[in-house]
Amino acid sequence: MKGNMNNMMKQMQKMQKKMMQAQDELHEMTFEATAGGGMVTVKASGKKEIIDVEIKEEVVDPDDIDMLQDLILAATNDVLNQIDEKTNDTMGQFTKGMNMPGMF
């Protein structure tokens, strides 16, 4: 019985190490999304930090700031959703079969 418990603890430690490595790899990744046919591009790290916003000159219209704001929001939300999906896919492999809602 004690051997089984030790074995299980070793397995958990291995899984924890793999999870941390996967999380580190996610944090190092860069994600990119565009809106308006490439008029606005937003780049973010896997830590959900916005690292770059590119706006094409043609889309800057002082009389239509709302459109530019909408494009920035759309690209930002898209890139954040990409990060969430990748995180769920990557980390989900560790929680398959476990009942841990809202873990990631």
UniProtKB/Swiss-Prot annotation:
It comes from the Bacteria. Residues 1-23 are annotated as: Disordered. It is found in: Cytoplasm, Nucleoid. Keywords: Cytoplasm, DNA-binding. InterPro entries: YbaB-like_sf (IPR036894), YbaB/EbfC (IPR004401). Gene3D superfamilies: Nucleoid-associated protein YbaB-like domain (3.30.1310.10). GO terms for molecular function: DNA binding. One of its GO terms (cellular component) is bacterial nucleoid. The keyword Mitochondrion does not apply. Pfam families: YbaB_DNA_bd. The keyword Cytoplasm applies. Homodimer. Belongs to the YbaB/EbfC family. Binds to DNA and alters its conformation. May be involved in regulation of gene expression, nucleoid organization and DNA protection. This is Nucleoid-associated protein OB0030. It comes from Oceanobacillus iheyensis (strain DSM 14371 / CIP 107618 / JCM 11309 / KCTC 3954 / HTE831).
